Amino acid sequence: MQTASFKNGTLKIGTRGSKLALAQAYLTRRLLQEAHGLPEDAIEILPMSTAGDRIQDRPLSEVGGKGLFTEEIEQALKDGRIDIAVHSTKDMPTVLPEGLHLSVFLEREDPRDAFIGRSARRFMDLPQGATVGSSSLRRQALIRRLRPDIEVVMYRGNVDTRLRKLDAGEVDGTFLACAGLRRLGLADVITDLLDPSVFPPAPGQGAIGIESRIGDERIDVLLAPLAHRETQIALACERAFLGALDGSCRTPIAGLATVEGDRLSFRGMILTPDGRQAHEVTAEGVVSDAAALGTDAANRVRAMAGPHFFDGWQ
């Protein structure tokens, strides 16, 4: 593990090169500048291409899962070529490379899924036989659960690509994270926001996570003011739930925690890819037990589903 390049005078932020990833990196830079009175040239953003960005013709579940979006960036972090990495937390595996951790979560944006419709504004108002594009197994399963009459097609690409395909009439509607659209200034394209009690989001959705080297005390001090208490607590629960279920891009898993004062509420769900089977679990407790609540919820929902629920489709 290399020493921090920030010792040479510039903090280096690693990120994917998409518009959304860059918007999140620029937000992180601005927050660091405001927290520490740093000039703009004290922080450099280094866009990187990842395997997940390059492979666009197949579902992520077929080619390696969430790690495809992080491997190259994490190697740069381990090598000392960058000091921190900025990620969409929902894209992060629960097991990180040795020596790295998600040290800080920024204040969460709206975690809900957004529907962008062409033939109907509301998802539930789509005509029978309509076509919806999504590459997320969770969204595909939820769509099939709620509207088994709808055809779901694989739909990859960045936000611009997906919206362009929609405008071209390739599908009648698509789903994107509300948070990403808002960060890109595209909230006006949203035609429907899905109720998380009916269409629960992915664990970590809407939250930006900052990955750093374990034991890099100077970086820890720099990042500390950016940590958002409620988001940190909620994601401790959600990621514990995901991790206990061995969640990846190959598993339709949903989960959302909310924090009020010293109390936490959590709702999680696991589904079969066809949406025909779904098992839901809820949990409540004190915030200090966030991770334990997530793990316990995962154990309970796994027991509900039975030992063969995951067979044949992981």
UniProtKB/Swiss-Prot annotation:
Keyword set includes Amino-acid biosynthesis: no
Cofactor binding, note field: Binds 1 dipyrromethane group covalently.
A GO biological process held by the record: protoporphyrinogen IX biosynthetic process
A GO molecular function held by the record: hydroxymethylbilane synthase activity
Gene3D superfamilies: Periplasmic binding protein-like II (3.40.190.10), Porphobilinogen deaminase, C-terminal domain (3.30.160.40)
Pfam families linked: Porphobil_deam (PF01379), Porphobil_deamC (PF03900)
Positions carrying S-(dipyrrolylmethanemethyl)cysteine: 249
Keywords (A to Z) from UniProt: Porphyrin biosynthesis, Transferase
EC number annotated for this UniProt entry: 2.5.1.61
PANTHER family, per database record: PORPHOBILINOGEN DEAMINASE (PTHR11557:SF0)
Record's function text: Tetrapolymerization of the monopyrrole PBG into the hydroxymethylbilane pre-uroporphyrinogen in several discrete steps.
Quaternary organization: Monomer.
More about this protein: The porphobilinogen subunits are added to the dipyrromethane group.
Family of this protein: Belongs to the HMBS family.
Protein name per the record: Porphobilinogen deaminase
Originating organism: Brucella canis (strain ATCC 23365 / NCTC 10854 / RM-666)
